From Swiss-Prot:
Organism: Triticum aestivum
Top-level taxonomy: Eukaryota, Viridiplantae, Streptophyta, Embryophyta, Tracheophyta
Induction: By pathogen infection.
GO terms (BP aspect): defense response
Name of the protein in question: Thaumatin-like protein PWIR2
Pfam assignment, any one: Thaumatin
InterPro entries, A to Z: Osmotin/thaumatin-like_sf, Thaumatin, Thaumatin_CS
Signal peptide: 1-20
Amino acid sequence: MATSPVLFLLLAVFAAGASAATFNIKNNCGFTIWPAGIPVGGGFALGSGQTSSINVPAGTQAGRIWARTGCSFNGGSGSCQTGDCGGQLSCSLSGRPPATLAEYTIGGGSTQDFYDISVIDGFNLAMDFSCSTGDALQCRDPSCPPPQAYQHPNDVATHACSGNNNYQITFCP
């Protein structure tokens, strides 16, 4: 089966405009946390003082990253005191409240990204969340106000970042 030159050109143009975002996650807590992410990121242990990264493809919508605490896993199964996602190390479900959430939608190429912190599902850890060219958001306690974090579904706390950027999430800043 021959590949059409037009199809190849279209794929090349769309691929050139799309880019992934890297989310650098730092644990400043004095204990291990288990960051989790959906639809990208799964879950993993992150010791005190450690940093890890998650690559999120362009076009990812309604993503969220949170830190689980008080976890115990045997292989891929176990439980967490906060943010547990069905007893799995690698999450495919949202975490059980309470969990402080870093929420995002990644555009493609020059399309804008959007991000926010949400405590609608409760608060379990202080968090800083920033885009390399956007606002630095800080939520240090359950009462962090808009525009720093969503407290209620009708709050205005979403921030925009130009496309082709990376993000920093710090737990226990």
